[in-house]
């Protein structure tokens, strides 16, 4: 059996569709015949149901995955308040330890063929005084998929994020254009610009451009993503 594949999903900002795209990728991987699991290592914002604390993003990932990870592996750190993780963690007396997440990821890799790891917020969200989500991606050593929320300002946000990813020595396996503003003028032109710049500067292909959906359907969106292109990039980036 080949070694499991894994990727780190980040975004140009918060609330731009990382969970939606991650769930769509999970559907695509499952359709490709892979055992697909998801991690949301740090989740901020919880609700209680049946005596257990849950998170809506994690619920969406669970619904899309065809391999269910134990909650403690899927989300090692579930914070109650929906705010910046390092602030909430400090108030709740929780240390967001990257080593704990790396260990959970190692265990997840024993259970599935491909693991989608969804970050929190953008690429550089503080987890502690001196560590952020970029440090987490480096510790995991994973190729990155960038979700670009297509709205005014997205070109600069995407290029800056791609630079930050490259500066940490991580491969940008591809990016997804997610149309979060259905009224945005020249959306296709923005996507075309990013396609050219990210390909030229980072050799990062566009994996798909997702139409605005209301309500969102990750399963439907998965058909617009080139999962095989991504799988080839992940295999090329995997340790030999």
UniProtKB/Swiss-Prot annotation:
Its cofactor is Mg(2+). Transmembrane segments: none annotated. GO terms for biological process: biotin biosynthetic process. Gene3D superfamilies: P-loop containing nucleotide triphosphate hydrolases. It catalyses: (7R,8S)-7,8-diammoniononanoate + CO2 + ATP = (4R,5S)-dethiobiotin + ADP + phosphate + 3 H(+). Mg(2+) binds at residues 19, 57, 118. ATP binds at residues 15-20, 57, 118-121, 178-179. This is ATP-dependent dethiobiotin synthetase BioD. The active site is at 40. SUPFAM superfamilies: P-loop containing nucleoside triphosphate hydrolases. One of its GO terms (cellular component) is cytosol. Signal peptide: none annotated. InterPro entries: DTB_synth_BioD, P-loop_NTPase. Catalyzes a mechanistically unusual reaction, the ATP-dependent insertion of CO2 between the N7 and N8 nitrogen atoms of 7,8-diaminopelargonic acid (DAPA, also called 7,8-diammoniononanoate) to form a ureido ring. Homodimer. Keywords: ATP-binding, Biotin biosynthesis, Cytoplasm, Ligase, Magnesium, Metal-binding, Nucleotide-binding. It comes from Burkholderia pseudomallei (strain K96243). Pathway: Cofactor biosynthesis; biotin biosynthesis; biotin from 7,8-diaminononanoate: step 1/2.
């Amino acid at each position: 059996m080949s070694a499991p594949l894994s990727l780190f999903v980040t975004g140009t900002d918060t609330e731009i569709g990382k969970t939606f795209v991650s769930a769509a990728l999970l559907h695509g991987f499952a359709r490709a015949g892979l055992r697909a699991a998801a991690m949301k290592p740090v989740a901020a914002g919880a609700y209680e149901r049946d005596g257990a604390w849950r998170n809506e993003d994690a619920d969406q990932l669970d619904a899309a995955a065809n391999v269910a990870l134990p909650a403690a592996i899927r989300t090692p750190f579930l914070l109650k308040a929906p705010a910046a993780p390092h602030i909430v963690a400090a108030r709740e007396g929780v240390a967001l330890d990257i080593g704990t997440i790396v260990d959970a990821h190692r265990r997840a890799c024993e259970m599935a063929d491909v693991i989608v790891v969804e970050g929190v917020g953008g690429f550089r969200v503080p987890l502690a005084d001196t560590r952020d989500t970029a440090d987490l991606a480096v510790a995991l050593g994973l190729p990155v998929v960038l979700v670009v929320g297509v709205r005014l300002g997205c070109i600069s946000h995407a290029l800056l994020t791609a630079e930050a990813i490259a500066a940490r020595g991580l491969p940008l396996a591809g990016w997804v254009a997610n149309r979060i503003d259905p009224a945005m003028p020249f959306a296709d032109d923005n996507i075309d610009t990013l396609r050219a710049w990210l390909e030229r500067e980072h050799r990062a292909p566009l994996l798909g451009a997702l139409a605005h959906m209301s309500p969102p359907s990750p399963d439907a969106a998965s058909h617009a993503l080139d999962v095989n292109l991504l799988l080839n990039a992940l295999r090329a980036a995997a340790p030999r």
